[in-house]
């Protein structure tokens, strides 16, 4: 049995003169929760449609369980799709919606009832079998759509932005339910979203896409903490970008980098030559803020002076926008409440307040400047 349940090989898709996928290679592991993440128009839904059989690649191959299924129609692939709109039949009961697929394939009698009720029980809707879709909440309709896909016992379940129509709290709850369901069933899930937080919280691996190309494939932690290029760094979460120049190379993978007059010894996973322009990337939560009266003159000499331009209270955190004095660049920082600061006064920043900024060296990512 192959480790990979579904695979794209050199898949290209063009509509007339417009190419929306450029020679994509993708292997989906058996039993994993894989998310295709990217902005609108990046090609993620096109990949889903190629896997489902709703579209055929212009060039390239689709394999399912090691077999070439490029020419097979959707009903012969062992793959089911949950659509963004759910596509439930409004005139049918929940039971009949879920039973629709097996009935088409000739399943009936006690076997049909057993399979339908098992699917409804799996999504915790076994008590709703005789209701109509209009009598259900958005989250319940979502679960009916999932049950309708699961009742066919697919090798792979494809989900096309299927949480986007839900409100914030329900969407968060369904993220947890979907991941638990996938783990319980052991079925491969391929999920499409443009929501970075959704991708990071649910996935075993994330495929980051842009302009019809795969930019990076990795675990949520890898794509967040070790982005392979500036697009991934900027699209997956927020990030600050400082442009610098390599002024010395050391043999241990560390470099002296000049950031507008501050020469800092930093380590990089990539190789750079003296004189190379680089982007030093720092997440907002990794920046540290020094206020007036904190640190000695010697401490502050190597830090970046700035001014607080905006204070954004978010309940559990306070976000600051700081304008650097030397370059006029804006940095975004996230400050967390301290349990020893019951009044929250330590995060009581003022617009216009002078501050200094630095970070723990080693938490940055250094990439070639683009």
Residues covered by each model-derived region:
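ABC ATPase nucleotide-binding domains
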Residues: 33, 74-234
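The feature captures the beta-strand-to-loop junction immediately N-terminal to the Walker
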Residues: 37-39
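Non-catalytic connector elements of ABC transporters
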Residues: 239, 249-370
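Conserved ABC transporter NBD signature motif
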Residues: 60-68
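Helix-to-loop junction immediately C-terminal to a conserved catalytic motif
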Residues: 52
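Conserved coupling/switch loops of ABC nucleotide-binding domains, chiefly the family-specific signature
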Residues: 58-61, 111, 211, 243
């Amino acid at each position: 049995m192959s480790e990979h349940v579904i695979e794209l090989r050199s898949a290209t898709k063009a509509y007339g003169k417009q190419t929306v996928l450029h020679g994509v290679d993708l292997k989906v592991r058996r039993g994993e929760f894989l998310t295709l993440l990217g902005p609108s128009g990046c090609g993620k839904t096109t990949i889903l449609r190629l896997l489902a059989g709703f579209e055929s690649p212009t060039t390239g191959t689709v394999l399912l369980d090691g077999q070439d299924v490029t020419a097979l129609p959707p009903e012969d692939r062992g793959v089911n799709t949950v659509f963004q709109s759910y596509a439930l039949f409004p005139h049918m009961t929940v039971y009949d919606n879920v039973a629709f697929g097996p009935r088409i394939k000739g399943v009936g009698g006690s076997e049909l009832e057993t399979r339908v009720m098992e699917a409804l029980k799996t999504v915790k809707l076994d008590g709703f079998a005789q209701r109509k879709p209009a009598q259900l909440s958005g989250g319940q309709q979502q679960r009916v759509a999932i049950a309708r896909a699961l009742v066919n016992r697919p090798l792979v379940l494809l989900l096309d932005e299927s949480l986007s129509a839900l409100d914030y709290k329900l969407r968060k709850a369904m993220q947890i339910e979907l991941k638990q369901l996938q783990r319980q069933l052991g079925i491969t899930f391929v999920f499409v979203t443009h929501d970075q937080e959704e991708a990071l919280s649910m996935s075993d691996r994330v495929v980051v896409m842009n302009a019809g190309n795969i930019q990076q494939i990795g675990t949520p932690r890898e794509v967040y903490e070790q982005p392979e290029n500036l697009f991934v760094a900027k699209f997956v979460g927020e990030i600050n970008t400082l442009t610098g120049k390599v002024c010395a190379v050391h043999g241990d993978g560390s470099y002296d980098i000049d950031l507008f007059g501050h020469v800092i010894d930093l380590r990089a996973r990539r190789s750079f030559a003296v004189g190379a322009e680089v982007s030093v990337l720092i997440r907002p939560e990794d920046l540290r803020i020094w206020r007036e009266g904190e640190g000695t003159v010697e401490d502050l000499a190597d830090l970046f002076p700035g001014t607080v331009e905006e204070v954004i209270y978010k309940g559990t955190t306070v976000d600051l926008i700081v304008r650097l004095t030397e370059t006029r660049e804006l940095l975004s920082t996230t400050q967390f409440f301290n349990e020893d600061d019951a009044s929250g006064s330590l995060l009581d920043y003022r617009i216009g307040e002078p501050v200094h900024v630095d970070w723990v060296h080693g938490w940055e990512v250094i990439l070639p400047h683009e």
